[in-house]
Amino acid sequence: VAEGIDAHGLAANKKERDAKVIELLETVGLQAEHADRFPHEFSGGQRQRVGIARALAVNPDFIVCDEPISALDVSIQAQVINLLEQLQRERGLTYLFIAHDLSMVKHISDRIGVMYLGSLVELADSEELFENPMHPYTKALLSAIPIPDPDIEKNRQRIMLEGTLPNPIDLGEECKFCSRCPVCKDSCHKSQPKLVEVKPGHFVACSQCAE
């Protein structure tokens, strides 16, 4: 936690640095005694809180959260998300939240970007994306989210992507999703589609969706 403080010269001396560390630990729900522990002495949730404290140490406006809850139990995931939301309200933070759990992404995000093989294929406000997905890959992802109602769940139609993944280091000129896309046409093999605004604030990289 103190590393960022030292690197950026944010404390005049060791006493001030140690005080900042304790303040940061308490901000994320830990205690002063945790400052003297080794990493293996923390639980998974506590380690995530330490990571958040480290990020806060340099007084950021923008934080990249790369899979911050993927290895945690569901109850701990909720605690970490609640902490992130609380800090966002209190400090006016902006997050880039990277995750595979689409339900959690919907909960915490204002805008969502869907990526496939390193490229954005769809970008829209959270509610708009979930209510009106346009790219075939986005539709397949959303169809895989389980619904906690057995009557609805058993009758849902999931979109199963067939085909194989292309070689990511030799994609050629065609659309990256061609080999698995259910609406692929001959024109899709000729060029990679650009991200186009198809309605206000809603962007899609698919020549079939943009028509």
Describe the predicted segments one by one:
Residues 38-42, 46:
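Conserved ABC ATPase signature
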Residues 64, 68, 72, 76-153:
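P-loop NTP-binding/switch modules centered on Walker-like glycine-rich loops
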Residues 5-9, 15-33, 142-143:
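Conserved ABC ATPase "signature" region
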Residues 125-211:
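Charged, flexible cofactor/metal-binding loops and thiol motifs
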